[in-house]
């Protein structure tokens, strides 16, 4: 991976750096939001889930307009503006004494992060030929997971001094990237096609809704994100119901470490092999591995079985993430690439709904039923992906194989 990064232009490496640094900034604080909301604002567990989930959903919905801006503006001022919002929102969260202000800051953090993520992915389309993009997507996802793996440890270190300090550290990381991009960012980078006439936001939205491939891929991503978007949350819920707190902590810490190590070590080498010619086959393999992994979770009685099930589940994750990016990349017109990636971000709604739906099932049904429900979501998501891959687009592309 390092050898590949050395061949990339500085502009592309700066975009990839955003994925690492800004993800690290989020990961510093995200694991401690539950504790912070409980201790500082005296919220119950249900209200905490509502706050965290709804801010993610609102940020994802608002990022649709961010994708529109990616297609209309040069990336340099847009990334700098969003990075400034990201930094100031963390500073605001640090000083917020009222829940509504803290809530607003969380929405802004999620929105700014989502728009920068869209700009980064759109930048791949401007800077790389088609056959090199899957490799770049795999590098991006690897760096993202490195950020999520390291961030909680940094957050734990500063939170031991003061529970509010992780927000300051996150703001510092955001400010650091702002300064780096301000000095070395490419001021001419854009996904804008000058020959395209300006189109209102709502008109662009209608165009997207008429692209049935995009609709199918978005629905497929939303349904499958219920399963892999926040798997640690529903696994924790399941273990709390079925085991002791000590066992829950031991299993969760082990499977999370297994997931992180596998993604960091295998994502690049496996993800770069995913090609546009056989996306449906790759995705079917990844989704099948999810189902096998979920079956393993349902049957797990020992730590070893949990680790094996997580290893299989993680292989599915390693395949599905770059395959999803390549699906969107394969159908997105150059002048609407930002909007198409913004539509893909709606999968975060599924990620936010996963713990909620699993909580409802755990409260009303035998505990193992959550895994049967999640398997149904994988099957439904795979069906929408298959339908989208079989629809011939208006751009005369061959159906995906």
Which residues make up each language-model segment?
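Cytoplasmic helix-loop-helix junction between adjacent transmembrane helices
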Residues: 107-146
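Short amphipathic helix-loop junctions that connect adjacent transmembrane helices
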Residues: 32-46, 233-252
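Symmetry-related core transmembrane helices of the 12-TM Major Facilitator Superfamily/SLC fold
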Residues: 166-182, 371-387
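Juxtamembrane intracellular "pre-TM" segments in multi-pass secondary transporters
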Residues: 1-9, 188-217
């Amino acid at each position: 991976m390092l050898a590949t990064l050395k061949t990339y232009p500085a502009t592309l490496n700066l975009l990839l750096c955003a994925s690492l640094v800004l993800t690290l900034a989020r990961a510093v604080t995200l694991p401690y939001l539950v504790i912070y909301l409980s201790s500082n604002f005296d919220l119950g567990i249900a209200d905490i889930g509502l706050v965290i989930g709804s801010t993610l959903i609102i940020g994802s919905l608002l990022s649709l307009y961010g994708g529109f801006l990616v297609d209309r503006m040069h990336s340099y001022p847009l990334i700098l503006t969003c990075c400034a919002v990201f930094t100031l929102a963390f500073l605001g969260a640090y000083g917020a004494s009222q829940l509504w202000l803290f809530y607003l800051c969380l929405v802004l953090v999620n929105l700014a992060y989502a728009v920068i993520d869209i700009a980064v992915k759109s930048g791949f389309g401007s800077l790389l030929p088609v056959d090199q993009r899957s490799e770049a997507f795999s590098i991006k996802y690897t760096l993202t997971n490195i950020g999520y793996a390291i961030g909680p440890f940094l957050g734990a270190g500063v939170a031991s001094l003061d529970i509010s300090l992780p927000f300051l550290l996150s703001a510092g990381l955001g400010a650091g990237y702002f300064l780096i991009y301000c000095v070395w960012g490419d001021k001419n980078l854009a996904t804008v096609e000058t020959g395209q006439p300006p189109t209102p936001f709502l008109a662009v939205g209608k165009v997207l809704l008429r692209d049935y491939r995009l609709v199918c891929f978005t629905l497929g991503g939303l349904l499958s994100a219920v399963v892999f978007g926040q798997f640690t949350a529903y696994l924790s819920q399941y273990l709390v119901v079925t085991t002791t707190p000590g066992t829950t902590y031991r299993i969760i810490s082990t499977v999370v470490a297994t997931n992180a190590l596998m993604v960091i070590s295998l994502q690049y080498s496996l993800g770069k092999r995913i090609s546009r010619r056989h996306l449906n086959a790759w995705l079917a393999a990844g989704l099948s591995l999810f189902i096998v992994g979920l079956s393993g979770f349902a049957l797990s009685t020992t730590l070893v079985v949990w680790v094996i099930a997580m290893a299989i589940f993680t292989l599915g994750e390693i395949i599905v993430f770059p395959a999803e990016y390549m699906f969107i990349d394969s159908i997105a017109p150059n002048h609407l690439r930002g909007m198409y990636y913004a539509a893909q971000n709606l999968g975060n709604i599924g990620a936010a709904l996963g713990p909620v739906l699993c909580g409802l099932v755990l409260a009303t049904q035998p505990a193992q039923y959550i895994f049967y429900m999640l398997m149904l979501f994988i099957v439904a998501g795979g069906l929408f992906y298959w339908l989208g891959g079989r629809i011939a687009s208006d751009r005369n592309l061959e159906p995906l194989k």
